[in-house]
């Protein structure tokens, strides 16, 4: 449950621990990214070319949104103590991984779009061989003939208590592309908290 997740972040857990919990319950990542509510498919360790993405979430309607996620631990500050220094090295690693995925998808867009729609159908039909979760709606109302909307998200580290405004400016400044987002685990938990506040578990 979300309390277990919050505990991991408060304990400044390392990446492996956080990854393990999310892989055991992919709804954490899916709830963070799904729009509309409950309409998603989430994969872990998803192959993109010869690389592997930590998580991929498929969501939206008509034009499918493909969210490609790399995560790091909660055992460092997302932005360095001197905010002129930019992001922590672990976040830069995540961004490099995402840029590799971005380059592959941009070069092989058509085949990737075909692959992701095929894997979406396999997951819905319970035929996908990897670790995945299909949302409670059990389907995605997306059109395989339309382009896909690919977003890249790096999640890692925790916020410094006194630097939220400078930190948000720093994160925006460090974004290498409009479709690449950077988030701390604090912002991840805030969004999940808000989500579960609006959609309490029945």
Residue ranges and their predicted role:
Residues 1-202:
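Charged, terminal alpha-helix-loop-beta segments
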């Amino acid at each position: 449950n979300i309390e277990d997740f919050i505990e991991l972040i408060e304990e400044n857990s390392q990446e492996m621990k956080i990854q393990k919990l999310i892989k055991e319950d992919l709804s954490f990542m899916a709830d963070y990214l799904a729009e509309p509510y409950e309409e998603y498919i989430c994969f872990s360790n998803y192959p993109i070319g010869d690389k592997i993405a930590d998580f991929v979430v498929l969501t939206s309607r008509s034009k499918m949104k493909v969210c490609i996620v790399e995560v790091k631990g909660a055992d460092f500050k997302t932005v360095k103590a001197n905010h002129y220094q930019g992001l922590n090295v672990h976040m830069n690693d995540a961004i490099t991984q995402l840029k590799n995925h971005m380059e592959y998808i941009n070069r092989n867009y058509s085949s990737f779009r075909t692959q992701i729609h095929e894997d979406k159908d396999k997951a819905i039909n319970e035929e996908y061989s990897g670790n995945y979760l299909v949302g409670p709606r059990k389907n995605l109302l997306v059109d395989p003939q339309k382009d896909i909307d690919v977003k890249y998200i790096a999640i890692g580290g925790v916020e410094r208590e006194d630097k939220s405004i400078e930190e948000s400016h720093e994160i925006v400044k460090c974004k290498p592309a409009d479709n690449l987002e950077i988030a701390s685990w604090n912002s991840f938990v805030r969004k999940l908290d808000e989500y579960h506040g609006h959609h309490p578990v029945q």
